[in-house]
């Protein structure tokens, strides 16, 4: 296994931020789809993928809750479309 591969599959207790988790999941999927892994490597990557997926799901749920709270606490509850040019 290359150094890059070992960095992409960090220990299960080391859960990175959402964006890095998604990137690691994509790398795991690509590696598994190539079908060049041993059974042990594939199982290890699958297990890591499950942990990363759960981490991402929790992060998304937390973000959804924050958005819901922010919308609840807004003055009129109505949020207009995003316009990046508005200052």
UniProtKB/Swiss-Prot annotation:
EC main group: hydrolase
Keywords linked to the UniProt accession: Cytoplasm, Exonuclease, Hydrolase, Nuclease
Subunit structure of this chain's protein: Heterooligomer composed of large and small subunits.
GO cellular component: cytosol; exodeoxyribonuclease VII complex
Keyword Cytoplasm recorded: yes
Entry's EC annotation: 3.1.11.6
Protein task: Bidirectionally degrades single-stranded DNA into large acid-insoluble oligonucleotides, which are then degraded further into small acid-soluble oligonucleotides.
Molecular functions per Gene Ontology: exodeoxyribonuclease VII activity
Keyword match Ligase: no
Gene this chain is encoded by: xseB
Chemical reaction(s) catalysed: Exonucleolytic cleavage in either 5'- to 3'- or 3'- to 5'-direction to yield nucleoside 5'-phosphates
Organism name: Halorhodospira halophila (strain DSM 244 / SL1)
Family, per entry: Belongs to the XseB family.
UniProt-listed GO biological process terms: DNA catabolic process
Name listed for the protein in its UniProt record: Exodeoxyribonuclease 7 small subunit
Compartments it resides in: Cytoplasm
């Amino acid at each position: 296994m290359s150094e890059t591969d070992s960095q992409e599959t960090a220990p299960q207790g080391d859960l990175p931020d959402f964006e890095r988790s998604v990137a690691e999941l994509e790398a795991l999927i690509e590696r598994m789809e190539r079908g060049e892994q041993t059974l042990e490597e594939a199982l290890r990557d699958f297990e890591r993928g499950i942990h990363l997926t759960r981490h991402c799901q929790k992060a998304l749920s937390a973000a959804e809750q924050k958005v819901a709270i922010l919308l609840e606490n807004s003055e009129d509850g109505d949020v207009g479309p995003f316009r990046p040019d508005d200052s």
